[in-house]
Amino acid sequence: MLAVLLSPVSQAATQAATQAAFDPLLEEHQSLWLQGGQAVTPPAPDSDASLAADLTIHAALDLPEIRPLLLRYSRQHPERVLHYVNRSALGLEAQYLQAPLTPQADLMISSAMGLQYRLANQGHALALEAPNLAAWPANSRWRDELYAMSFEPIVMVARRDALKRLADLDGLRNPRDVLRSHRDFWHLLETRREQLRGRIISYDPRRSGSGFTYAVSDARQSPRYWTLVRAMGQADARLVSTTGAMLEALASGEVDIAYNLVGPYAVTFARAHPELVVIVPEDYVLIQRRLAFVPQQAPHPEAGEAFLDWWLSLQGQQAVASDSQLGALHPEVRGEGSAQHMREQLGDALRPIEIGPGLLATLDRLKQASFLSRWVLEFEAPAPFAGEASQGQGQGQGQGQGQIQGQAPSATQPELNQ
């Protein structure tokens, strides 16, 4: 349940944070121009980029994950100049809403499922008719306007040397047996708190929209979630706003275990860092799906629809499976890199975040503040006295135990980053 009573302090903190919100339009973003699979010179800064390109895609999806697919599509359509812009989810929405009646992008893709659903629900998305879109599974789209493009597990990542140390402490032969589930993670925080103090990292749900969505989904899936939040705080867990920040902290040796990371980013990073291991929880796995739509005012709506139709085609989905870690959703694509392969391995443990009105609940300010108020109370709850057993869900208000990167704790509006 999202609804809990707000304390006056939490309400004041939320109002202050809203008034002092950062400007997402000033954030840095990545841009890529392609034609025929080759990089091309971008137009002059004072020109209209949406008119210089034949296909403009604005997305909250890191370039390393989508670049191979953009190159493949560009080679297949050499007549088109393709412009790809990557922003945070909040920056993506803010840029669009600054001038929603002005032609900007031909396709918008975001991991912030609630934001995408809200824009489509408010009438910003075109109804599409391309054949592969019409055949897309009903549970992976909303009407004919909003389409799921990925099937991404939310995972944990750990340092191999840390798992080895913890396994030795518990007399386990296989270090992988130390951490296989959410329950194992909670057990480690309870029994190895001193060894892990300051060595855990996760999303700050007050500063990350994705982190907030995962926190809400965790709370819906597990009655133990609030004791997990309390245990993280008592272990001085560090909180950041992106999966990338977690991965960098792991690689540098600053932390040992990261919780609730975007799976594709984690897998790609771990391939270059063999000291890390990606853990897909065995008890339940949250599944994020990036959602895409063609804006009503797209400068080249037919180009945006054509790209999305290619992505969801059998050919496109085979490319998604082979060229990325995003997860192919097409029912005929099997094997590594497909949602079907994940279903065969994990079965009922998969928990896809549903595409529907429930997403709007994560955007309601009062419900956000209520949930975050409870989250702060648990995370900042004081550690038990020596020898005292952990006692369920915390109600006390103590000094904050966790380490929040970049700001002091407060129940603020999430910044809806990736």
PLM region spans:
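Extracytoplasmic ligand-binding site segments that recognize negatively charged/polar headgroups
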Residues: 60, 64-67, 104, 111-116, ...
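Alpha-to-beta junction loops
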Residues: 79, 100-108, 124, 196-198, ...
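Conserved C-terminal helix/tail region of periplasmic/extracytoplasmic solute-binding proteins
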Residues: 352-418
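A ligand-binding cleft/hinge motif common to bilobed small-molecule-binding domains
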Residues: 114-118, 251, 255-275
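Short beta-strand->loop
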Residues: 125-134, 145-148, 274-286, 295-297
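Mature extracytoplasmic/periplasmic domains
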Residues: 295-359
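A bilobed periplasmic-binding-protein/Venus flytrap-type ligand-binding module shared by bacterial periplasmic
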Residues: 157-162, 214-217, 288-300, 319-320
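Early extracytoplasmic/lumenal segment of secretory-pathway proteins
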Residues: 22-118
